[in-house]
Amino acid sequence: MATGKIIQVIGAVVDVEFPQDAVPKVYNALEVEGTTEKLVLEVQQQLGGGVVRCIAMGSSDGLSRGLKVTNLEHPIEVPVGKATLGRIMNVLGEPIDMKGPIGEEERWAIHREAPSYEELASSQDLLETGIKVMDLICPFAKGGKVGLFGGAGVGKTVNMMELIRNIAIEHSGYSVFAGVGERTREGNDFYHEMTDSNVLDKVSLVYGQMNEPPGNRLRVALTGLTMAEKFRDEGRDVLLFIDNIYRYTLAGTEVSALLGRMPSAVGYQPTLAEEMGVLQERITSTKTGSITSVQAVYVPADDLTDPSPATTFAHLDATVVLSRQIASLGIYPAVDPLDSTSRQLDPLVVGQEHYDVARGVQSILQRYQELKDIIAILGMDELSEDDKLVVSRARKIQRFLSQPFFVAEVFTGSPGKFVSLKDTIRGFKGIMNGDYDHLPEQAFYMVGTIEEAVEKAKKL
């Protein structure tokens, strides 16, 4: 193993000089010697003259010029397989849950090729989430990719936790959760939530939180993905949750600037599309097994045309858009039924009835949206009888799209509800057909099935 020495440290970027005949390859891992904490660097550029520019996977505090660095001669490798279940690991696959070594049988490099075209497979099976608005408007496909888009504080992480809880309990497969640049508190809450719902032994957790250097946050998504790929290649259907994909992009922006690349639109890295592609192309299903992924996507300043969310859109099968306006009405989950889409919402996949009900719900809500201006200026009395009926049904639908969550029981004080797709379609079909025109709209707020709304109306 060749050794070199540090010649320059600029924040998270470290330049290391090696002998001319032993320059490490790009993406090779290097280990710094003589530091109290283990520090791994990843080669990003070869500058010539035996010098390589690297990003640090940990804090570069206390590094000095002249420290010895060893070339490990392979990319960063992490534990994979069943030994990782129920454990919390960092970007290097080291345990951070104080439960001793992982005891893995195999380690895989985090940089891997995406599967070839011949190996790819797609599926039309639906994954039932038990969340009414998602199952109805933007159904998820098994082996598909779902994005949860939303600005700050509209409920991406809570929706993600509810999805994990529902799917992990209903679907008995394995899941991998990658916490990319999110709050440590959320990671902690998440761990306890998994423990309480008794699904921790089916989940591998990989965390690279907000306080970590950019190199760490840039690679932690790949660490989680590598663990998911191992389960997929063993022939399993695995779930991959990434919270938050925007922080992956942001870490790339930080690293790109430190490496001296010219910024592109809005200050993002010039390699934005390629970096996103490298990650997303690997999140796919093959003939052996499937990876179903749910990714939270932070939308800066609620602007969906920002280059980061816009680049992510292209890779997804279903997009769940969370709206600040709906959250301000107190309707949770704050999913915008007119902005959310899914490739599965096709009569050939979901069936004619589901398709008609979903499109019917959207058209009623769209009509209500158009009438809002008239109501604001002239008042409800100026509407025709038909339009009054549309408004009344739209307001009921809007409230019926809300639902109490299991993971939010502490905040709402009402028990969570899992609603089957069959019940969801039946409920919305009834509202559209006017079967519940006699009930007050408050009865539809924060209930599960339509029967609960009828019961609630009796108490009002």
From Swiss-Prot:
Plastid listed as a keyword: no
UniProt keywords, alphabetically: ATP synthesis, ATP-binding, Cell inner membrane, Cell membrane, CF(1), Hydrogen ion transport, Ion transport, Membrane, Nucleotide-binding, Translocase, Transport
A GO-annotated cellular component: plasma membrane
EC number annotated for this UniProt entry: 7.1.2.2
SUPFAM superfamilies linked to this entry: C-terminal domain of alpha and beta subunits of F1 ATP synthase, N-terminal domain of alpha and beta subunits of F1 ATP synthase, P-loop containing nucleoside triphosphate hydrolases
Membrane topology value: Peripheral membrane protein
UniProt keyword Cell cycle, yes or no: no
PROSITE patterns: ATPASE_ALPHA_BETA (PS00152)
Chief localization: membrane
GO MF entries: ATP binding; ATP hydrolysis activity; proton-transporting ATP synthase activity, rotational mechanism
Compartments, as annotated in UniProt: Cell inner membrane
Pfam families: ATP-synt_ab, ATP-synt_ab_N, ATP-synt_VA_C
Family annotation (InterPro entries): AAA+_ATPase (IPR003593), ATP-synt_VA_C (IPR055190), ATP_synth_F1_bsu (IPR005722), ATPase_a/bsu_AS (IPR020003), ATPase_alpha/beta_chains (IPR050053), ATPase_F1/V1/A1_a/bsu_N (IPR004100), ATPase_F1/V1/A1_a/bsu_N_sf (IPR036121), ATPase_F1/V1/A1_a/bsu_nucl-bd (IPR000194)
Catalysed conversion reaction: ATP + H2O + 4 H(+)(in) = ADP + phosphate + 5 H(+)(out)
Binding locations of ATP: 150-157
Domain of life: Bacteria
Family: Belongs to the ATPase alpha/beta chains family.
NCBIfam families with a match to the protein in the record: atpD
Subunit architecture: F-type ATPases have 2 components, CF(1) - the catalytic core - and CF(0) - the membrane proton channel. CF(1) has five subunits: alpha(3), beta(3), gamma(1), delta(1), epsilon(1). CF(0) has three main subunits: a(1), b(2) and c(9-12). The alpha and beta chains form an alternating ring which encloses part of the gamma chain. CF(1) is attached to CF(0) by a central stalk formed by the gamma and epsilon chains, while a peripheral stalk is formed by the delta and b chains.
Primary role: Produces ATP from ADP in the presence of a proton gradient across the membrane. The catalytic sites are hosted primarily by the beta subunits.
Protein name as annotated: ATP synthase subunit beta
Gene name tied to this protein: atpD
